[in-house]
Amino acid sequence: MKLRIGTRRSQLALDQTNWVVEQLKTHYPDIEIEIKKIETKGDQLLNVSLSKVGGKGLFLKEIQNALLQGEIDLAVHSMKDIPTETTEDLEICAITKRVDPLDALISNNDITIDELPENAKIGTSSLRRGSQLKAYRNDLQIIPIRGNINTRMNKLQELPELDAVVLAKAGLVRSGMTDSISQNISPEIIVPCPGQGALGLEIRHDNENLKEKLAVLDDSESRKAIGAERAFLNRLGGSCHVPVGAYAEIISNELHLTGVVASEDGQDVIKRSVQTHLSDNNKIPSTLGNDLAEELIELGANKILSELKEG
């Protein structure tokens, strides 16, 4: 069997794709795999805030086009980058077991958020991270930085004014850089991005043979948790590049979901948690996500998001 896999060009994307390749070769030793590196619009717009150009699909549209045109058979994405709206003729046939979905602080002198000096400057281009950091400590100053993991880590040495940067822990794990972590940031401080920490394997809808083979990489618990998070995000009409966070986990067959919407300055924060018992009903995660989103909408979430768009 021959398989052409499409991925972004970044080192993290390649690390993630190589992990998928290793898993597939474990299950199918005779498989022949070719990796095709594809540059996306999001990779090109390094000097622009993604929230300003419309965050949805910026890191996968070109890869999806290659899939639709038959240039590749499988696309490997970070789940957090995949829009909640489905693309016709394509489907996410597997969601891999989630690596730690939380965010992490990398700081000078290896100190925590609480230990940072007054008016400390933290590097992140994420409105979600920045707004929640401001809500937690309103003296903190958010400095926009873009680029891959190494680029953003290097900013800490290159920019003397920076005291810390915030990155997804999963990326640090996959890149073998966990020694740099100063603090694993609790969802009490920053609720992570929906889907963060897992990979989504996307194929053409009619490729039944490949769908069957990729089923071995699908993790049911991750699919349920992320299903709830993405339903929450979808109801709010957001993407990974708006100040919306969602974090779900399964504890003793109970699905727990926390959702947050925050204004950019951190002054207005709406955050709630819900839980439900899991059964064989596949609609439970999406129902939970929708219900939580409706609760936040009643509390004013749409007003916060519309003001952000207008601004």
Swiss-Prot record:
Enzyme category, top tier: transferase
Protein name per Swiss-Prot or TrEMBL: Porphobilinogen deaminase
Organism, scientific name: Natranaerobius thermophilus (strain ATCC BAA-1301 / DSM 18059 / JW/NM-WN-LF)
InterPro entries: HemC, Porphobilin_deaminase_cofac_BS, Porphobilin_deaminase_N, Porphobilinogen_deaminase_C, Porphobilinogen_deaminase_C_sf
Pathway recorded for this protein: Porphyrin-containing compound metabolism; protoporphyrin-IX biosynthesis; coproporphyrinogen-III from 5-aminolevulinate: step 2/4
One GO-annotated biological process of the protein: protoporphyrinogen IX biosynthetic process
In-chain residues carrying the UniProt-annotated modification S-(dipyrrolylmethanemethyl)cysteine: 240
Molecular functions per Gene Ontology: hydroxymethylbilane synthase activity
PANTHER family: PORPHOBILINOGEN DEAMINASE
